[in-house]
């Protein structure tokens, strides 16, 4: 915590945003409250559901912690209207939208194929951390024609690989190779119920690959009416519906999620200090830091 305190004092931020509810986020939150600095936060992970999936911890306990953490935030940023509505029902305040963007230059259609030519088509792809909360087993156990591929690594990979020998587990991919994997697939399958958005959905769409998913947070805000994918309580039904979609239309839809729009929305949501207060505050803090250093050296 002392290192965070020193870095903030040296950097003199115009605004503070806390992107994690973990140890670094807790320390930064405590410093901001101590210094009476306004700050914003964001809700990237359905933490209560993740913890409940891994350990015998009731979801309500996780939500109690998250409400405590985000309560002093000037603005809690969330990726989708559906998540905003759910958090408001749980008693969260100051909830504001912050949509996501995708790198449409890296993730683009018609990249060089990366999967072996002898893998039967269609190729059904999942990308992400291979962990129980991602619900990947719902994908790999589907009865689908062609080849199922999982790109990524994680604690559940060895177990799934042993139990589903017909599925291709490639390990992690990055950069151009990852973009090629998205582009080479026929359908991207997103089986998670616990993500708050699912950036991989946009990455797949940017390459022209349609997305099949459950009607969960993220997919339910991105896919319906887009012509870029399908959602259904029966994941196989959603998968098969994607085979007939126009890949050019999928790409065109993804182009509406730009990094510029996402960045501008983020900046609008920040809670900077008024200029006059900021100058006085950091001047006072620098003076206190000098006094502390002198006392420590004495």
Where are these regions (language model features)?
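Short alpha-helical donor nucleotide-sugar binding micro-motif in glycosyltransferases
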Residues: 8, 180-185, 266
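Nucleotide-activated donor-binding/catalytic signature segment of Leloir-type glycosyltransferases, i.e.
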Residues: 157-176
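Nucleotide-sugar donor phosphate/pyrophosphate-binding loop at the beta->alpha transition
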Residues: 38-40, 49-68, 78
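Donor nucleotide-sugar binding/catalytic pocket of nucleotide-sugar-dependent glycosyltransferases
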Residues: 63-112, 119
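Aromatic "clamp/platform" in nucleotide-sugar-dependent glycosyltransferases that forms part
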Residues: 21, 193
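A charged, aromatic-enriched C-terminal amphipathic alpha-helix characteristic of glycosyltransferases
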Residues: 112-114, 243-287
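Conserved donor-binding/catalytic core segment of Leloir-type glycosyltransferases
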Residues: 115-149
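Short hydrophobic beta-strand element within catalytic cores of glycosyltransferases
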Residues: 210-213
């Amino acid at each position: 915590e002392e290192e965070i305190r020193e870095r903030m004092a040296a950097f003199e931020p115009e605004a503070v945003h806390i992107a994690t509810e973990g140890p670094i986020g807790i320390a930064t939150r405590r410093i901001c409250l101590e210094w009476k600095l306004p700050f914003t936060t964001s809700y990237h992970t359905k933490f209560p559901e993740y913890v409940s999936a891994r350990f015998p911890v009731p979801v309500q306990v996780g939500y109690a912690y998250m409400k405590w953490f985000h309560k002093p935030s000037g603005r809690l940023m969330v990726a989708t209207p559906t998540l905003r509505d759910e958090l408001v029902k749980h008693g969260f305040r100051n909830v504001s939208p912050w949509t996501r963007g995708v790198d449409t230059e890296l993730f683009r259609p018609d990249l060089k194929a990366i999967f072996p030519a002898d893998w039967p088509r269609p190729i059904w792809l999942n990308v992400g951390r291979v962990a129980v909360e991602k619900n990947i087993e719902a994908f790999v156990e589907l009865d689908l024609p062609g080849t199922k591929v999982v790109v990524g690594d994680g604690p559940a990979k060895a177990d799934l690989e042993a139990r589903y020998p017909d599925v291709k587990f490639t390990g992690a991919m990055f950069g151009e190779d990852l973009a090629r994997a998205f582009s080479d697939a026929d359908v991207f399958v997103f089986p998670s119920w616990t993500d708050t958005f699912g950036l991989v959905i946009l990455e797949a769409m940017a390459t022209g690959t349609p997305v099949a998913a459950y009607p969960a947070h993220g997919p339910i805000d991105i896919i319906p009416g887009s012509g870029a994918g399908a959602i259904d309580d029966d994941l196989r039904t959603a998968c098969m519906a994607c085979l007939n979609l126009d890949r050019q239309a999928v790409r065109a839809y993804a182009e509406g999620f730009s990094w510029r729009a996402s960045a501008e929305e983020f900046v609008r949501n920040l809670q900077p200090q008024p200029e006059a207060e900021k100058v006085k505050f950091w001047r006072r803090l620098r003076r206190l830091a000098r006094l502390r250093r002198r006392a420590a050296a004495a």
